[in-house]
């Protein structure tokens, strides 16, 4: 029997196993060595059991898969050939690991006899992603010496470990030949005879029974709930954010939220008003802080957490450490709604009124300071006006704009907001946004900086695969305006940090056959958005702003609010 047939049998078992573990999207980069895996993924698609996506750039492909997995909340498989194609996936793997997004990376490899001997496109791929995967499976070359049952079991066990997210790396060496295998030869191969019954059923080989761990009420909760408390809410999936705001309100406790929290802020603009030292000192009088989620964007929220010395509780539904300030704390590995149910509130009046007064003052002051012109700060402040009321998702890129949005906006509760704030890189943001559109099957609005866009231009090609409206805002402040915040010499800052490019994006949109608009006023933007939302295609909207406007407004707001005298 030809090696090409058995390579396909081996690949069939791998992909059938992953399909039963919830994988329905296969992101494929072109390459010869990965042919057995690619052809079996295509077979699943032809049988209505999966969707294949192809892209020529592995780095973008990895982030595209990341976006699909974020939005669908299901594992996504990535298939690449051997060599440096595999290394290009590393940034997306890092981001997935940092944010517990389930990716399954399938790297085709040369067989062992072709490694370390000068063979073409052969690098050391085993365990190449170090500690970032939760499981690294280095398969042997396909051989009938290993049973199909063994192969399924190895993969099933790894997928069980992935139930709380993370990356699985499966390295699959194939010897030639790789082509000309007949489907009947594959399906009737005797090696598959012991799993024929399983192949006809849509169930996992190993049936894991779910274990429901009840959250135990803290033994001193009756005492702690009478104290002065603060709720801090970081990055949370929307389904885990329900009930937190009502619970905090009943307790009369201060609640500070991140834009990634999916919780409607009762005290918006926290990253601005926390600059006020008078109010911050009063907040530090709290006796307990309870943290839901993690990954806070705002600098002043992080500074407050670093200063706080009282009782500290963290509710996080995984085993990771999420306290960069190393408080002595109580940790609950639980979903927020389970924890809330086990810790009923005690209705009380608010213990501190100054934050409410300061938040109201901020609202008026911010509106006045950002003005009516179309700029970074006004976009962030009015972001809710740009979004459809339903059936849509928002993706925020990194650098300056995500900080402005976190500090100046008031998003609706449970509006789906996605970010790449695990490692907070500017790579792969367009690709991630495209993946989120695919995974959510909803209208996409993405806000991405100019430097980030230049970093990921190849990913514009992915938007041609979409079948729904997608709006990509490119915020063009002529380089890295986030670095205006740094205390660096102006000439050095311009050359080595900001790196002004003096580019605009109309020709790039045209190259990828995407719609393009450059509005100058809010009225222009309203017209552009109305047209863009009516089309089942992608529109690039370039917002060209003065380089320093966003950072200057941000710094000015922090300075003015920081010194404001607020009475209640």
Curated annotation (Swiss-Prot):
EC number: 2.2.1.9
UniProt keyword Magnesium, yes or no: yes
MF terms in GO: 2-succinyl-5-enolpyruvyl-6-hydroxy-3-cyclohexene-1-carboxylic-acid synthase activity; magnesium ion binding; manganese ion binding; thiamine pyrophosphate binding
GO biological process: menaquinone biosynthetic process
Keyword annotations: Magnesium, Manganese, Menaquinone biosynthesis, Metal-binding, Thiamine pyrophosphate, Transferase
Catalytic activity: isochorismate + 2-oxoglutarate + H(+) = 5-enolpyruvoyl-6-hydroxy-2-succinyl-cyclohex-3-ene-1-carboxylate + CO2
Needed co-factor(s): Mg(2+); Mn(2+); thiamine diphosphate
Binding note for cofactor: Binds 1 thiamine pyrophosphate per subunit.
Isomerase among keywords: no
Highest taxon above the source species: Bacteria
Subunit text: Homodimer.
Family affiliation: Belongs to the TPP enzyme family. MenD subfamily.
Function field: Catalyzes the thiamine diphosphate-dependent decarboxylation of 2-oxoglutarate and the subsequent addition of the resulting succinic semialdehyde-thiamine pyrophosphate anion to isochorismate to yield 2-succinyl-5-enolpyruvyl-6-hydroxy-3-cyclohexene-1-carboxylate (SEPHCHC).
Protein name: 2-succinyl-5-enolpyruvyl-6-hydroxy-3-cyclohexene-1-carboxylate synthase
Species whose genome carries this gene: Histophilus somni (strain 129Pt) (Haemophilus somnus)
